[in-house]
Every structure is written in C-alpha cells, then in structure tokens.
Regions:
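ABC transporter nucleotide-binding domain
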Residues: 165-256
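Short, flexible helix/strand-to-coil boundary loops that buttress conserved ligand/catalytic motifs
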Residues: 69, 215-218, 235, 265, ...
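Short, surface-exposed beta-strand/loop "edge" segments at domain boundaries and coil↔beta transitions
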Residues: 148-150, 228-232, 259-262
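Short phosphate-engaging motifs
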Residues: 16, 67, 189, 230, ...
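Short loop/turn segments at beta->alpha junctions
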Residues: 89, 210, 276-279
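ABC transporter nucleotide-binding domains
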Residues: 2-4, 9-201, 207
Length: 300
C-alpha cells in the first residue's frame, strides 16, 4: 500500500505539489490526471523516492521510500522518456537492472522477450520510439516490482502493442498483486486501465475516487423548460459544473445523486429531460472548468 501524507514539493518559489494526501491500495491500478504543469510528474518522482518532499512523507508498506534501498528495490519508475546508457543493447541494460534490482527474474525476461519480439543484442539508440518504449516495459516488468510507476507509458506505441501491454499489466495485477500508478493525458487509455483516478490542478489534488464512483457521480442533463425563469433556481439546489444553451435545449453538467438531480429538474415540469452518462474525458474537462481552468476554446 502506498500512503502519501500531506506531501508538498517546492522548486524555487513555485509550489509544484501542495499538501497532497492519497492512499493507493495493493493491487490497484491508479490513474493520475491533470492539467499541464499540474505537478503530476513531480508527485510521481516523489512517490518513487527520486525527490525528497519538502513536507509530508511517502510510505510504502509501512516504510519510508526516500533513501531506503530495500523499499526502492521493489519500485520501478518509468519516465516519459526512458533513459538507457549510450550505445547499450537491451541485454546490456538487462545486466545492469539485474545488478540493481534484487528480484530480477531471468525467467520472466525470457518470457517477455517472446512477447515483444525485440532483438536483445540490438542497440537501443537504433530503435524507434515505440520499440524503446517496449524495451522499457520489458526491463521494468522483469524486475518483478511490487510497485510500477509510469509517466505517459503508452506514448508512441501502436494499437496492437498498447493492447498487449495492457493485458500484461492486468496479468501482473491479477497474479502478483502489482500496484500500478499511471500518469497520462490519454484519458481513454486511463479509462480502460484504471480502477481508481486522481485529478490534479496547480499542485493540488481535486479528486480521488474509484472510477465507477466518479462516473456515477457526474451527469450530463439535457433539458428544455416550459418557462426559462426556472433555470436560475436550480443553481441553489444542485452542484452545477457547467451550463450552456443550445437552441431551446439547455445542457447541464451536474455532480450528485442521479435521482436527486432528476427530481430537482422534474419539479419544473420540463418537456424534455434526459440524463446521460459522461466519459472520463468529459468529466475531466468539466472538473477543470470548475477549478478555474480555461476550457472555452475546447467547447467552441
């Protein structure tokens, strides 16, 4: 289990992470979303023990991460641009990983090699971006980590390889209880992969919820009133994230219980009333608007 307790990180005069508390349970796949510059990568590096938090602590299975080799030996961090030694081949990097990670499995390395179909003797600097990303997964999973932290891990991969890697991650979670933390701007990928989601903005954590709960708690309402004066009265009754008019129909994005929302609209006897589900991408956009992020260009 990963426990993030009131963690803050400051670079010069900029607060990259501000007092974040978060618990990620063993065997979960946690998706970290956020606006550009929200502090996602800083938080991931702090969880991985690369950065020392200026305040708060990161605890994994009851032990601190920073400057704790035993705990770090069970964590693998995959940055958005994987780093390999100059002129190194996949096999040479495997030798290095074997010397660093005590749980390295040569058997697992061999198994995964059959999936990725990369030549282990080939130099990594001669591979395409997508092939280097495959190599990064190959090496990371061969370390048999308890915690895998990934920053934009599927970027550059073709659809077939994306599906393969998702299946391997699901297998690791199901069979070994792997805990995975994924930061990505591809919300459809997060929606497919994750069972829990956090949304960051300007260094703060806005949302920390199970994905199913988040989707069931936010609704798109299309409504046409017989009397337009009713529109204003709803603001005091419901938590409205967004409202716009499309001809005679009004569109609302509302947080809360579905039946309570429907009842609040039915009071005014609308002649059109539909409650529709939202995708994670839509929820993200409207939550960002609620946090003051300018989404006007998106909605045009």
């Amino acid at each position: 289990m990963i426990e993030i307790r009131e963690v803050s990180k400051v670079f010069q005069d900029r607060k990259a992470v501000q007092g974040i508390s978060l618990t990620i349970h063993k065997g979960n796949i946690f998706g970290l979303l956020g606006s550009n510059g929200a502090g996602k990568t800083t938080l991931l590096k702090t969880v991985a023990g690369i950065y020392l938090p200026d305040a708060g602590s990161v605890i994994i299975d009851g032990k601190p991460v920073f400057e704790n080799p035993d705990t770090k030996g069970r964590i693998v961090f995959m940055p958005d641009f994987p780093y390999f030694f100059p002129q190194a081949s996949i096999m040479q990097m495997a030798d290095f990983y074997r010397s660093v990670y005590p749980r390295w499995s040569g058997e697992r390395f061999k198994e995964l090699g059959g999936l990725f179909s990369l030549d282990p003797k080939r130099k990594l600097n001669r591979l395409s971006k997508g092939m280097r990303q495959q190599a990064a997964f190959w090496l990371a999973l061969s370390c048999m980590p308890d915690v895998l932290i990934m920053d934009e891990p599927l970027d550059g991969l073709d659809p077939v390889m994306r599906r393969l890697i998702k299946n391997v991650l699901f297998q690791e979670v199901a069979e070994r209880g792997l805990t995975a933390v994924i930061s990505s701007h591809n919300l459809r990928e997060i929606e497919d992969l994750c069972d829990h989601v956090g949304i960051m903005h300007e260094g703060a954590l806005l949302i920390d919820k199970e994905l199913d709960e988040l989707k069931s708690d936010t609704h798109k309402v299309q409504v046409a009133f017989r009397d337009e004066r009713h529109e204003g009265a709803l603001s005091g009754k419901l938590q409205i994230l967004h409202r716009e008019r499309r001809g005679s129909v009004c569109l609302y994005i509302v947080k809360g219980d579905r039946e309570r929302i429907a009842d609040a609209f039915r009071v005014y006897n609308p002649y059109v009333l539909d409650l529709l589900p939202l995708t994670l991408e839509e929820i993200f956009i409207y939550e960002m608007e609620g946090a003051g992020y300018d989404i006007a260009p998106i909605l045009l």
